[in-house]
From Swiss-Prot:
GO terms for cellular component: catalytic step 2 spliceosome; cytoplasm. This is Peptidyl-prolyl isomerase cwc-27. Its EC number is 5.2.1.8. Associated with the spliceosome. It is found in: Cytoplasm; Nucleus. GO terms for biological process: mRNA processing; protein folding; RNA splicing. Its main location: cytoplasm. Gene3D superfamilies: Cyclophilin-like. It catalyses: [protein]-peptidylproline (omega=180) = [protein]-peptidylproline (omega=0). Residues 279-307, 316-348, 361-374, 513-525, 532-541 have a biased composition (Basic and acidic residues). The keyword Isomerase applies. The gene is cwc-27.
Length: 541
C-alpha cells in the first residue's frame, strides 16, 4: 500500500463532503488535473452540489453522484457556452475541440496522467457520457479496484483518513431489484473547501434569474388585456359611464333577460318552441350589430362568443324535463324495456343454470339439513356415536336396576355351587417314557437317541396336549385368598428386631483392635520384647 502512495503525486487541494452518512475528506490533484479540479471546486463553492444525492450504486465497484436532478442524465460544467475561454483563462478557445469548442460548447476534456490510476478503493473520478471529452458535473468514488476505468475516466482525487469507512457504509446501502438506484439514497448536504489553489476563484451568481424576470413581462401584459376584457363584460355599466360611445353594451343584458324570460314561459306552455326560435333569430342580428359598430376592437366578438354559450346550457337544462315527459309517452318507451328484457333473459338463464347445478350436486344434503347445537357442531364428522338407550329405559329406570341385581345374584349362586379346588396336581406323564422305566428310573432322565442329550427339548413333542388339562375347570371360583397376619408393623416389633440385627462398626475402634492384634502376634514371635539385648538375656536364662 505504501508503494501505491509513493507512485501517486502529492495533492494540492482538499475539501470535505458532508453527507447524511458522515463526512468524506477528499484530496485533489489540482496540478495534474487543473480543469477537472477547477470545475469541481467552483461548483462546490457555488453550492451546486448541495442537497444532491448519490443516485447510482454498484456494490464493490462505484458510487456516483453530482447530478442535481437525481436521475443521472443532468449536470453542467463551468466551461459550458464558451465560458472561461479567453487567452488568459485556464482553457482558451483555441485549445477546445469538437463539442467543447464554440460559444455553444458543452462539457470539457479528459485529463489523464500516468501516475493516476484506478487501482484501489476510495479514488475520486469524473463520470462522462461514455465518450471522450464529455465531462460535466457528475463524479464517482471507487469501492474497489477498477482498472477498466483507467484511461476512460479522469481521476482527480482520493479519500483521506478514516473517512474511507463512511464511504464503505455508503457502498453497503440497499439497491433496487434489477437496478442501480439505492432504495434510500445518501444526500450531500454541502461541500466545505479547505485548500483552494485557484486564487482567482469566486462564488458565481445563478444565471436563471434574468430569465425569470423576462418571462413574467408578457404574461402580465396578456393578463392586463384579459382583465380589461373581463371588465367590459362583467362591469358594462361602469364602462358605459366612462366611455359614452359604447351604447350597445346595455343591450346585451336586455337580450339575456329576454332569453331567460322566454325560457320560463317555455316551461309553462307548449308554444315555447316557436318563441325560442323567434328569440334566437332576434338574438343573432343583435349580436352581429355589436361588432359592426365597433369593428376596431377585435376581442369584442370573441367576448360575445364567450357570452353566447353561457345561456345555452341553462336553456338545455330547462329543456330537458319536457323532453323527458315526451319520451315517456312516445316511442322510446318500448326501447328501454327491450334492453332490460335482454338483460333479464340472460340473468334468468344464468340463475337457472346455477339452480340446476345446485339441484344436481346438493340435492340430498339440503333435505337432511338440520339445525345443530353448539355442542353438536364441535363433534367431528368422523366420530362414532354410541348406542342409544332403549325407548322405555328413560321412562322406567327401575327395570334396568332390577336386571343388574338379578345378574349379581345369579353370579353369587354360581360361586356357592362351584366344585372344590383341586389341592394336588397330578404329575405330568410323558408319553415317550415307558411304564417300566418310570418305576425304576424316576430320577434319571432319558437320553436322546439323536443328540445323546438328557431331556432333549428338540426331540420332545410340544404340540401334544396332555390329557389332564381341563380348560372348563371352575374350581378356581371356590378358591380363597389367605395371607399371614402382619404383626410386626402393628406392635413395633419389626423396628425392635431391626435394631437388634443392625451392626454398628466404629472404624477408629476397629483400627485400634487390629493394631493390638498385630502387636500381640509380633510379641508372641519375639518373646514379648523387640530389643536385642533383652532377647539375649532371655536366651541365657
Amino acid at each position: 500500500m505504501s508503494a501505491i502512495y509513493n507512485l501517486e503525486p502529492q495533492p494540492t487541494a482538499s475539501a470535505i463532503i458532508h453527507t447524511t452518512q458522515g463526512e468524506i475528506a477528499v484530496e485533489l490533484f489540482a496540478k495534474q488535473t487543473p480543469l477537472t479540479c477547477r470545475n469541481f471546486l467552483q461548483l462546490a463553492l457555488d453550492g451546486y452540489y448541495d442537497n444532491t444525492i448519490f443516485h447510482r450504486l454498484i456494490p464493490g465497484f462505484i458510487v456516483q453522484g453530482g447530478d442535481p436532478s437525481g436521475t443521472g442524465h443532468g449536470g453542467e460544467s463551468i466551461y459550458d457556452n464558451g465560458a472561461l475561454s479567453g487567452d488568459l483563462d485556464p482553457w482558451p478557445m483555441d485549445q477546445r475541440r469538437g463539442k467543447n469548442a464554440g460559444p455553444h460548447g458543452v462539457n470539457f476534456k479528459d485529463e489523464f496522467h500516468s501516475r493516476l490510476k484506478f487501482n484501489r478503493r476510495g479514488l475520486l473520478g469524473m463520470a462522462n457520457e461514455g465518450a471522450p471529452d464529455t465531462n460535466s458535473s457528475q463524479f464517482f468514488f471507487t469501492l474497489g479496484k477498477a482498472d477498466e476505468l483507467t484511461g476512460k475516466n479522469t481521476m482527480f482525487g482520493r479519500v483521506a483518513g478514516d473517512t474511507i469507512y463512511n464511504l464503505a457504509k455508503i457502498g453497503e446501502a440497499e439497491v433496487e431489484e434489477g437496478g442501480e438506484r439505492p432504495l434510500y439514497p445518501i444526500k450531500i448536504t454541502r461541500i466545505e473547501i479547505l485548500i483552494n489553489p485557484f486564487d482567482d476563484m469566486q462564488k458565481r451568481e445563478k444565471k436563471p434569474r434574468p430569465q425569470q424576470i423576462s418571462r413574467p413581462t408578457p404574461a402580465e401584459k396578456k393578463q392586463k388585456k384579459r382583465k380589461g376584457g373581463k371588465q367590459l363584460l362583467s362591469f358594462g355599466d361602469e364602462v358605459g359611464d366612462e366611455d359614452g360611445e359604447e351604447l350597445p353594451l346595455p343591450k346585451k343584458p336586455k337580450f339575456d333577460t329576454r332569453i331567460v324570460a322566454d325560457l320560463d314561459q317555455d316551461d309553462s306552455s307548449k308554444q315555447s318552441a316557436s318563441k325560442k326560435s323567434s328569440a334566437k333569430r332576434d338574438a343573432k342580428p343583435v349580436a352581429n350589430d355589436v361588432p359592426k359598430r365597433e369593428e376596431k376592437p377585435e376581442p369584442k366578438p370573441v367576448k360575445e362568443s364567450r357570452r353566447s354559450p353561457s345561456p345555452q346550457p341553462v336553456a338545455q337544462k330547462k329543456e330537458q324535463p319536457p323532453k323527458k315527459h315526451y319520451s315517456e309517452h312516445s316511442s322510446p318507451e318500448p326501447e328501454e324495456p327491450k334492453k332490460k328484457s335482454l338483460l333479464e333473459k340472460t340473468n334468468e338463464e344464468i340463475a337457472a343454470l346455477k339452480a340446476s347445478m345446485k339441484r344436481t350436486i346438493h340435492s340430498e344434503p339440503v333435505k337432511q339439513e338440520k339445525k345443530k347445537s353448539a355442542l353438536e357442531q364441535l363433534i367431528p364428522d368422523t366420530a362414532i356415536r354410541g348406542r342409544k338407550r332403549r325407548p322405555g329405559a328413560s321412562s322406567n329406570p327401575t327395570r334396568e336396576e332390577q336386571e343388574a341385581l338379578d345378574l349379581l345374584k345369579s353370579f353369587k349362586a354360581k360361586i356357592e355351587t362351584a366344585p372344590p379346588e383341586k389341592n394336588a396336581a397330578q404329575p405330568a406323564v410323558n408319553p415317550d417314557v415307558e411304564d417300566g422305566e418310570q418305576d425304576g428310573q424316576a430320577d434319571e432322565e432319558k437320553v436322546c437317541d439323536l443328540h445323546f442329550i438328557a431331556n432333549c427339548q428338540s426331540c420332545k413333542a410340544w404340540d401334544k396336549v396332555e390329557d389332564n388339562e381341563d380348560s372348563g375347570d371352575e374350581g378356581w371360583m371356590s378358591h380363597k385368598l389367605s395371607f399371614a397376619a402382619d404383626k410386626l408393623g402393628k406392635d413395633l416389633s419389626y423396628r425392635k428386631k431391626a435394631e437388634e440385627e443392625l451392626v454398628v462398626i466404629d472404624p477408629l475402634a476397629k483400627a485400634r483392635t487390629l493394631k493390638e492384634e498385630k502387636k500381640a502376634t509380633r510379641d508372641a514371635k519375639t518373646g514379648g520384647s523387640s530389643r536385642a539385648w533383652d532377647r539375649g538375656r532371655r536366651d541365657r536364662h
